[in-house]
């Protein structure tokens, strides 16, 4: 009989300094789904080269909201980089939405972007292109190899902290100063 780990959905996955993969180095991911088949998350501190205005324009969605148009779209991870993922705090029913945790949702349907463009979207929202994925047991292995820390998800980290500060702020929530850690680890 195998024992499944505690699901990590609605946890922040924080890269430790030893994680050298450039895609994930100093990254913070919101884990959106986690079960025996693997895990899926969205990086929440990696800016892409796109603004939301550019993405909306490519989708044929118009908006006059200049701050919305200037919002940076995140690079959510290397999986499905052409797909949009919206992390938000709006419990309304969207065409394709998942409750990640209490008050945090992931939506992948066009209707949320149309609502945002019309000024009727979520109060807080992050838009990302792409996501991160881990196969069965892969995330658990990486946690055992000291590649990541986990911390409870926090709306302040997701929606109110500057992108460049999210890595240290997320770790600080559990009392860890990442700048004081070495970039190697050992096992007893």
From Swiss-Prot:
**InterPro entries per the record?**
AlgH-like
Q: Which domain of life is it from?
A: Bacteria
Q: Which GO terms describe its cellular component?
A: cytosol
Q: Which Pfam families match?
A: DUF179 (PF02622)
The family database entries (HAMAP family) matched by this protein are listed as:
UPF0301
- Similarity comment: Belongs to the UPF0301 (AlgH) family.
Instruction: From the Swiss-Prot or TrEMBL record, give the protein name.
Output: UPF0301 protein XCV3063
**Upper classification of the organism:** Bacteria, Pseudomonadati, Pseudomonadota, Gammaproteobacteria, Lysobacterales
